[in-house]
């Protein structure tokens, strides 16, 4: 007999405004407990120093979290010129202090050099793993691990404020871009060094900034539910976004329910008007029920790639 999961079955995505000072996994575990969810996962770690958008996926939505991991990100960052730290942020120790002789024109010219596709070597103080361990664990032990450079794209990087030794910027970038590394490299270009003092992720994919909620707000709703003796899900679940919001950027292929049944049993189908190639978001019927993602095979058919398992099917299998 299958081991029963602890927690309730719930599917969807919630946009958490991660506070500073805790890890992304700590954030995930707190929210998972509040929702009493049986299954949950985050979509890419934020540094403890960083705040902002952290999409968390529940239940079947975890199947599509990779699309959020691979999506574009937006950040607001404040850097302090004149000081380098061993972590490239204010959590580390100052290892070098230099005089700052920078004007706005020079700063803007250097910032412009980061736009476009370049190679970036990840920071040792990152969550990137080497032999199963995050790089920052090696760094804390004083061990330097060789890292391969990776292609990143900075779609835009704009100077918002330059006051004294503080530089504030907005960055729109591809996955895997380390803002601390950009800041460190900028400091070297300017000849004075720099480190991050504030970092906030303001966007993941096309999720609305205003849809973010704090852990404190969720805890307040949970307390209210207990106080008023109502089910917590009545207050918490309306904050969830649909599971297909993680793949909303994919082209939709809507099919009649008969074809959807074939797809849900693993069979490719011919759908009029489907794209000629690529990955697609599959929906069924007039209500456009999300059933999973598929790809266009060599015969031009829509073939299942990752399917939603509906709750009634789960219950039947028990």
UniProtKB/Swiss-Prot annotation:
An example Gene Ontology molecular-function term: tRNA pseudouridine(55) synthase activity
SUPFAM superfamilies cross-referenced by the UniProt entry: Pseudouridine synthase (SSF55120), PUA domain-like (SSF88697)
Residues the record marks as active site: 47
Pfam short name (any one): TruB_N
EC main group: isomerase
Similarity comment: Belongs to the pseudouridine synthase TruB family. Type 1 subfamily.
Entry protein name: tRNA pseudouridine synthase B
Species of origin: Aliivibrio salmonicida (strain LFI1238) (Vibrio salmonicida (strain LFI1238))
Lineage: Bacteria, Pseudomonadati, Pseudomonadota, Gammaproteobacteria, Vibrionales
């Amino acid at each position: 007999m299958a081991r029963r999961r602890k927690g309730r079955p719930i599917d969807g995505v919630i946009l958490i405004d991660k506070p500073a000072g805790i890890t992304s996994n700590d954030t995930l575990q707190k929210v998972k407990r509040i929702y009493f969810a049986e299954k949950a996962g985050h979509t890419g770690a934020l540094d403890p120093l960083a705040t902002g958008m952290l999409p968390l996926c529940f239940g079947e939505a975890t199947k599509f979290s990779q699309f959020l991991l691979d999506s574009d990100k937006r950040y607001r960052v404040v850097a302090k010129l004149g000081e380098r730290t061993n972590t490239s942020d204010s959590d580390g120790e100052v290892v070098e202090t230099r005089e700052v002789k920078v004007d706005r024109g020079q700063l803007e010219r250097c910032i412009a050099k980061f736009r476009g596709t370049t190679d970036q070597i990840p920071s040792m103080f990152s969550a990137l793993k080497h032999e199963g361990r995050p790089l920052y664990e090696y760094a804390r032990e004083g061990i330097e691990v060789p890292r391969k450079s990776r292609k990143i794209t900075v779609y835009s990087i704009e100077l918002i404020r330059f006051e004294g030794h503080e530089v504030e910027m907005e960055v729109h970038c591809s996955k895997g871009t380390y803002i601390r590394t950009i800041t460190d490299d900028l400091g070297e270009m300017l000849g004075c060094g720099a480190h991050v003092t504030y970092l906030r992720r303001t966007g993941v994919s096309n999720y609305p900034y205003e849809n973010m909620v704090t852990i404190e707000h969720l805890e307040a709703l949970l307390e209210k539910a207990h106080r008023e003796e109502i089910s917590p899900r009545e207050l918490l679940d309306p904050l969830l976004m649909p599971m297909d919001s993680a793949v909303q950027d994919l082209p939709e292929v809507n099919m009649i329910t008969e074809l959807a049944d074939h797809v849900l049993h693993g069979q490719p189908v011919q759908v009029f008007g489907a794209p000629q190639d690529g990955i697609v978001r599959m929906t069924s019927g007039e209500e456009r029920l999300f059933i999973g993602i598929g790809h266009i095979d060599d015969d031009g058919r829509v073939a299942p790639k990752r399917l939603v398992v509906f709750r009634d099917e789960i219950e039947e299998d028990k």
